[in-house]
Amino acid sequence: SATAAREEYQRKRSQFIEIG
């Protein structure tokens, strides 16, 4: 589902930003 893909992308992006 597009929603799941979007959520996963956002989660990965958040994690990446957290790592810096």
UniProtKB/Swiss-Prot annotation:
GO terms for biological process: xenobiotic catabolic process. This is Monoalkyl phthalate esterase. Exists in two forms, E1 and E2. E2 is probably produced by modification of E1. Optimum pH is 7.5 with monobutyl phthalate as substrate. Retains 50% of maximum activity between pH 6.5 and pH 7.8. Inhibited by diethylpyrocarbonate, p-chloromercuribenzoate, Hg(2+) and Cu(2+). Not inhibited by the chelating reagents EDTA, 2,2'-dipyridyl, 1,10-phenanthroline, 8-hydroxyquinoline and tiron. Keywords: Hydrolase. Its EC number is 3.1.1.-. Probably involved in the metabolism of xenobiotics and of natural substrates. Hydrolyzes medium-chain monoalkyl phthalate esters.
